[in-house]
Amino acid sequence: MKKKLLNILFWSVISAAFIGPGTITTASLAGASHGVSLLWALLFSTLACMVLQEGAARITIASGLTIGEAVTLTFGNQPWMKWLLAGAVIFGCAAYEAGNIVGAISGAGLLFPLPPWVFTLAITGIATVLLWGGSAGSIAKSLGALVAVMGAAFLYTSFFIDESPLAITKGLFVPQIPADDILLVIGLVGTTIVPYNLFLGSGLGKCQQLGEMRLGLIIAIGLGGIVSMAVLLSGTLSPLPFSFEGMATVLEKAVGLPGKYLFAIGLFAAGFTSTITAPLASAITAQSIWGKGEKNWEATGTNYRLVWGSILIVGLVFGLLGLRPVPVILLAQAINGVLLPVAATGLLLVLNNNRLMVHHTNGAFSNLAGLFIVGVTLFLGIHQVARAIFMAIGYQSSFDSLYFASISLLALLPLFWLGIRIFRR
């Protein structure tokens, strides 16, 4: 029993990694704007996260390689695929970093009446020192405990909502896509299925058995999904227009004055830990694909530091620009939601590499689940891109049958190619 509990705590790193300012913002905004009707997006993304993270960890357990090394072996004669996968993850990290620093600034701003640029310089300065010295991990874990306490406060607050059990059940199992807010749906998916977590999960899979990995991972991610849903439910109590101040007031009403400060500290902690994690993940991703055995790609190497430093600079710039936090954070999650099909496609192709996975290649069910995940995220992403193009040329798109069929066809074409690649292996 003790071993199983420790295993769950071990894999809780993944759920802690996706409960950052992005989850707090997108889930709260979804609840405030659409009630419980978008719960299905969190249920889908939680289940999809389990499928993809299990696959990522299975690669390491079966082959003894990291995802980056497995990608290099699988696409050795297709360098463009390696660049595409690494580029998607690293670009996604840069987008996340913008939201992370803005989220940390917002949390600090709820506590201290100082100009945002002061917090920006302090946060990026401390993060640089920690990343340079290699002591970021222990600090991130300590602050992660504060995020967990804030999550517990959201769970408690969710019991005070006015929605009926029937409405909540419908929101969970009957998908609804608001035509004017597709970006929010993509954001909910992108904030839960974090592409760089696939690399993190792959590394955590070392020295574990498949059975214990699956149990720990499913329970840990499931708990993370429940907390995300609790944030959305709590968001239904927040007034519009949505703001962090309004959300702090919601928690204050539910748990008393400490709730306000708990939200502020938790938002800062979530943003700060993610400010460290995103640059680190981008450097690890680049290292695993391009830098095996090279001194410049070691943790103290020039290339390694250039990658995480570049991501940190992106966050610094966005923090100094003084942009409104909620749109920046939402856009960061949506960008990763659009990039997700690229990472998921690469993962599926590696999982179907017979020479690499031997007896642990994907079965029919795992492949169908993976194709479904890629299909849904492709559909959402293409719909958002199409809508943006239509708005740019002055055409108001609607969710009519012709439009729906066209977007579905565009999503099915790459899905059909992927299916042929997988099932002809």
How should each PLM-predicted stretch be described?
Residues 27-29, 54-79, 106, 137, ...:
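Flexible loop linkers connecting adjacent transmembrane helices
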Residues 84-86, 110-132, 149-154, 298-315, ...:
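Transmembrane alpha-helical segments of multi-pass small-molecule transport proteins
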Residues 79-80, 117-121, 219, 223, ...:
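Loop-to-transmembrane helix boundary motifs in multi-pass membrane proteins
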Residues 147-173, 182-203, 346-355, 380-388, ...:
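Hydrophobic alpha-helical segments and their helix-loop junctions in multi-pass secondary transporters
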Residues 49-57, 80-100, 105-135, 190-191, ...:
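Helix-loop-helix module between adjacent transmembrane segments
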Residues 44-52, 56, 212-237:
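Selective recognition of specific alpha-helical transmembrane segments in multi-pass small-molecule
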Residues 14, 41-75, 85-92, 417-424:
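Juxtamembrane transmembrane-helix boundary signature
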Residues 145, 298-306, 335-337, 342-407:
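C-terminal membrane-solvent junction of multi-pass transporters and transport-like membrane proteins
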